[in-house]
Amino acid sequence: MKLSLLAIAAIAPFVSAHYFFDTLIIDGQESSPNQYVRSNTRAAKYNPTKWVNTRDNMTPDMPDFRCNKGAFTFAGQTGTAEVKAGSKLALKLGVGATMKHPGPALVYMSKAPSTAKTYQGDGDWFKIYEEGVCDKNKDLKSDAWCSWDKDRVEFTIPADLPDGEYLIRPEHIGVHGAHAGEAEFYYSCAQVKVVGGGNGNPGPTVKFPGAYKKDDPSFNFSIYGGYKEYPMPGPEVWSGASGSKSYSKVVNVNAADATSEGTFGHREHARDFNY
């Protein structure tokens, strides 16, 4: 589903507050909106999913939490992009939005039994990327987070991932209201066919819904009152994946270090390091 210029203009005032992923980028080549990313049937495409003060009767406990409300109805008309294992991908937000909520970004994948177009996402999901806090010396209510004000989540398809068709699920979690149980989830699903892969065994795996619980510390976290370590949600990043960017356990990180890839760039299982 393509948005008209009039629709984009109507949405524009709201995109800094709410947003949606609709564009797949493969090795720097940007596709068209929803060419490879399933759309949704939300009253407004950018509506978040929440447990409290819900919109569109959607909560993280529903099957549509896999790819968003009504997304499977778009699966057949959504293309499946061929991507090489080891290639660099990104999922970009629609209509010029940026992630102007504090919180982590994550990327999950799930292998389709046959084709991505016919897969509802009811199988096993594994995490290939996550990013949390990049600089503990900045404001936890804003730019301390790696994803702050970015328009995309960038990651690498694991080189050892077996060939086949997959769903890729990018997710950004706004935690500005998490202290009151109102974490906001922004997510969608891209359809891809992985080629040139290996014999890896992705895991640990989870199911959606089920991977997240309303009382998880990740979704009842307060960004107020100074820095505190954020407990990343979901399973560990698959060890065969290229890495993560999250420095919430780094004791002394200055701004220069936090932005230097040579010192603190993408790191595998960054949250597991003991400092």
UniProtKB/Swiss-Prot annotation:
Subcellular location per the Swiss-Prot or TrEMBL entry: Secreted
UniProt signal peptide: 1-17
Cofactor note: Binds 1 copper ion per subunit.
GO MF, any single term: metal ion binding
Alphabetical list of CDD domains matching this protein: LPMO_AA9
Upregulation: Expression is up-regulated on steam-exploded bagasse as carbon source compared to glucose.
Glycosylation sites: N220
Catalytic activity: [(1->4)-beta-D-glucosyl]n+m + reduced acceptor + O2 = 4-dehydro-beta-D-glucosyl-[(1->4)-beta-D-glucosyl]n-1 + [(1->4)-beta-D-glucosyl]m + acceptor + H2O
Keywords linked to the UniProt accession: Carbohydrate metabolism, Cellulose degradation, Copper, Disulfide bond, Glycoprotein, Metal-binding, Monooxygenase, Oxidoreductase, Polysaccharide degradation, Secreted, Signal
InterPro entries per the UniProt record, alphabetical: AA9 (IPR049892), AA9_LPMO (IPR005103)
The organism's place on the tree of life at top rank: Eukaryota
Entry annotated with the keyword Ribonucleoprotein: no
Enzyme Commission designation: 1.14.99.56
Applied biotechnology uses: Lignocellulose is the most abundant polymeric composite on Earth and is a recalcitrant but promising renewable substrate for industrial biotechnology applications. Together with cellobiose dehydrogenases (CDHs) an enzymatic system capable of oxidative cellulose cleavage is formed, which increases the efficiency of cellulases and put LPMOs at focus of biofuel research.
GO terms classed as biological process: cellulose catabolic process
Disulphide-bridged cysteine pairs: C67-C189
Residue positions binding O2: H176
Any one GO cellular component localisation term in the record: extracellular region
First-listed, main subcellular location of the protein, grouped into a coarse class: secreted
Function: Lytic polysaccharide monooxygenase (LPMO) that depolymerizes crystalline and amorphous polysaccharides via the oxidation of scissile alpha- or beta-(1-4)-glycosidic bonds, yielding C1 or C4 oxidation products. Catalysis by LPMOs requires the reduction of the active-site copper from Cu(II) to Cu(I) by a reducing agent and H(2)O(2) or O(2) as a cosubstrate.
UniProt record similarity statement: Belongs to the polysaccharide monooxygenase AA9 family.
Protein name, entry field: AA9 family lytic polysaccharide monooxygenase D
Species of origin: Aspergillus tamarii
